Amino acid sequence: MAGYFFSLPAITQLTIPQQAAVGEPQQIALSGGPGTGKSVVSLWRHIRNYQSNPIKRSLLLTYTTTLKMYLADCCKTVRNEDFPDAGNLSSKNVGTSLKNSYKIHNTRFTEVIIDEAQDLSNDYYDGIVSPVSYGADDSQILYPDHCSHQAELKSLFPNNISHILDKNFRNTQRIMKFVKQAFPNANIPMSIIEGLSGNVGEWPVMQISYGNKYERSNENQDNAIESIINTLRADDHNIAVLVPWKKDAQYFENVLKNKNIDNSIYYEDDSRFPLGAKEIQNVHITTFKSAKGLEFDTVIIPNFNIIERTPIYIQREELMTEEYLTSMKKTIDRLVCLQKDHDILLSETERPDGLIDVTYRKLMCSWEDVFVACTRPRSNLYLISNYDLPYLNTVTEKVIL
């Protein structure tokens, strides 16, 4: 099984705005949409701290363990004749935001760089003892219960120098045209799409399986996933199967196992992954939320018709009362249940066995989750839907399975 193919651009390959952010002597407030290079800039800023002076003790933090692993491994690929240990030293000081909360409130670093800063509450930043640089994007807020909008971050760090990245380096033009059509609330500027004129690419492929929308999958969909992977997989080609929930990830893990396709998998589960993601292979299954910050050559999203059902809120399985489960089975268009102090909102009728995901806190699948998933691919985006989505016909290539 081949590992995830890492490709960190050389610092000389960064654009002038990106290099300016890396080299800014003061702390920075970095912003920009998906694919504009926020994580790359944060990573290079962290590495350069060690290249210029290894005793600086820079600390780079991000929200998910998968992205933390990716960034740490990218550090190891950097070679510098003047400071040969800079890559390894910087790699050792990449961590996740939540697990390093105590450290940054009690240990002083020359600089703490927080990637995906919008995923942390305002309280998280109170009392950090080191200078803070950060990157954030309001359109990628996936945890509205504990987040910080860019305006709030600006108030928290008023002296940080703003650096705005406005060119997409990840996606093709046709993928971004699709994203703009599918997610009007994302407010994607036309300048982003026009800037991709040199990387037109192929239209996302919409495969219609005509399966039961209440079932996790069907034979047509499973076979389509197998065919896509077997056609495209290569040692230097990264493929992801992205899904909303843990149980979906587990299901497709079994599908690939039965089809003899090696893969890695990650979802938030303290029992199975007590230390977070263990590895990333070049065929990887994960949830929308855990995919944020990562990029793949090819992304496959099964059951894409979920886009029409967002937002979906669910609670821990053990908190579900019999009264709630009974009400869930009723055929109604919209259901709002109050369970103890928590609201549960379903955008349309759902069977509880298809939605309940055992977790330690309330889960949500919003349009932002699906938006993040659709902006992960560099080249190919495959969307498999149980039924036709005509409003996307002009920005997809349709295939009937």
Language model features with spans:
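Conserved helicase motor core of SF1/SF2 NTP-dependent helicases
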Residues: A2-T77, N106-E111, E116-S264, D270-V372, ...
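Conserved NTP-binding/hydrolysis module of P-loop NTPases
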Residues: A72-P84, N88
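Short glycine-rich substrate-engagement loop in P-loop NTPases that contacts/grips substrate
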Residues: P84-I104
